[in-house]
From Swiss-Prot:
Record lineage: Eukaryota, Viridiplantae, Streptophyta, Embryophyta, Tracheophyta
Pfam families reported for this sequence: Oxidored_q3
Keyword field: Chloroplast, Membrane, NAD, NADP, Plastid, Plastoquinone, Quinone, Thylakoid, Translocase, Transmembrane, Transmembrane helix, Transport
Organism: Cycas taitungensis (Prince sago)
Protein's name according to its UniProt entry: NAD(P)H-quinone oxidoreductase subunit 6, chloroplastic
Gene3D superfamilies tied to this protein: NADH-ubiquinone/plastoquinone oxidoreductase chain 6, subunit NuoJ (1.20.120.1200)
TM region(s), chain numbering: 10-30, 32-52, 57-77, 95-115, 153-173
Gene (UniProt): ndhG
Length: 180
């Protein structure tokens, strides 16, 4: 989707806010079911960002694979877990939290330093005309489809069988029934 710069910027801000707030919900919510359910809107915001970047195929794959399959699988696995009572006392700050804070803060500061010290004007970005770019994207999508339905057909079928076995195993473990 080719949008003018100001419109793209206006759409970008709510999407990024949705990503940040949704990510915080995923991490900070204490109920694991709510946390798993709040992962869906985060993945949808990521796919909408791909649409703004003119990567329609990647956005569709993001919706189909992550939102449609992985998020449903996560919610399904969480629902099958035994509803164990967690202790009421949860420490607010642990050693692991402190280490994580130090690592994340140092990574953030190093990224900000790199971004600010990079000479962005020296990086030349050449783009093709929209017509040639759309033609290349169409050919790429057709090539991906051809590879997925011919060369990679067997690996995908094996992967689906492995996922099915993992799902049956997770259900068996969650129900804690003996196999007869």
């Amino acid at each position: 989707m080719d949008l003018p710069g100001p419109i793209r910027d206006i759409l970008l801000v709510p999407l990024e806010l949705g990503l940040i707030l949704g990510g915080l919900e995923v991490v900070l919510l204490t109920n694991i079911i709510y946390s798993a359910l709040s992962l869906g809107p985060v993945l949808v915001c990521i796919s909408l960002l791909y649409i703004l970047l003119n990567a329609d195929f990647v956005a569709a794959a993001q919706i189909l694979i992550y939102v449609g399959a992985v998020n449903v699988l996560i919610v399904f696995a969480v629902m099958l877990m035994n509803n164990q009572k967690y202790p009421n006392f949860v420490p607010l700050w642990t050693v692991g939290d402190g280490i994580t804070l130090v690592v994340c803060t140092s990574l953030f500061c190093s990224l900000i330093t790199i971004i600010l010290n990079t000479s962005w004007s020296e990086i030349s970005m050449t783009t093709k005309s929209n017509q040639i770019l759309e033609q290349d994207l169409t050919n790429n999508v057709q090539r991906i489809g051809a590879h997925l339905s011919t060369d990679f057909f067997l690996p995908f079928e094996l992967l689906s069988i492995i996922l099915l076995v993992a799902l049956v195993g997770a259900i068996t473990i969650a129900r804690r029934e003996e196999i007869v």
